[in-house]
Amino acid sequence: MQSEFLTFKEYIDFNEDEHFLSIGGGLGGLELIINENLQNKNYHFIERNFVSKKVVYGWSGKVNNEAYNDLNIQKSFLEINGMKPSQINIFDYDKDKLPDQKFDVIISLLSLDYHYDFEIYIEYLRKISNLNTKIIFDTIRPDYFLKIFKNVKVIALQENTTHKSKRILCSQFLN
């Protein structure tokens, strides 16, 4: 997670960025690292709250230890690792009304445009963004986003992994 943070650390304004949104961030390990560097910020998480019995972990093929989609475990994990309860806002994608405030930073690594097509979120992201909002996510089609955002910058390449992609930072929706 530290290496993930380092791919975008230089783009975070340590004084101005207060409100962070994580879409599909699992337990929130990345946000804990951000919190170590930027304490007392507000973190919002949009997750699904179910554990799939179809996903199997472990070499034997029999162990199912999936926990990253259990929102109670996520909240406990964040608190045990130093995030204050007042900093944590978790939303169940399937049941809750999603947050409608403006965010300074929106992060969705290997989720938005990876598991879920970007188009599913485009209107929602427009609604919760302002001119300075930074949206950071992984994609295999960075050029596609040139027609959606004024600013699109490739900030990291992930070419030596199974999930070959480019991490991009986007801001300022067009139209």
Q: Where in this protein do the model-derived segments appear?
A:
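Conserved alpha-helix/loop element of class I SAM-dependent methyltransferases that forms part
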Residues: 1-18, 33
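Conserved class I S-adenosyl-L-methionine
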Residues: 16-26, 44-47
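A short acidic, Gly/Pro-enriched loop at the edge of an enzyme's catalytic core
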Residues: 93-106
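A short SAM/SAH-binding and catalytic strip from SAM-dependent methyltransferases
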Residues: 104-117
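A short glycine-rich, Lys/Arg-flanked "PGG" loop and its adjoining helix->strand segment in the class I
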Residues: 119-132
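Conserved beta-strand signature within the Rossmann-like core of class I S-adenosyl-L-methionine
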Residues: 132-142
